């Protein structure tokens, strides 16, 4: 249980999910595999919490979903993060007032890094990410999307706990 944690993920409407998944699936079709968690919705992480907070977080998400509305966002750039052994290729939603207001609901998280909303496409060695980045950049054009759902997950192993739709 020491390595387990709960994560709040901000997810997208079906159209945005389809666009982002399509980009990632093209990478898979080209032979890239990566180390990122699979079979979870496209998202950006709002924060991590201790597993003992599960009931509290479930209640909190239900309340937040009633008070925060789904909101539009623009995806206008591809980016990279450097990790100790790997790099992360991502597509980032543009930060907005609505996104920051939602993030404020999770200011008590235990994350060790500064928050930078991003949707991971691939995690792998730097040379692999460099090649994958070129592939994504050849086809990427900015697009509009919508943040519409909050998910609560436990990792590792992956366990979906709850998903709540933001108000319309």
Model-flagged regions — what are they?
Residues 151-156:
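Short, exposed beta-strand-loop hairpins at the edges of beta-sheets
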Residues 1-72, 93-146, 160-168:
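Basic, often amphipathic N-terminal segments
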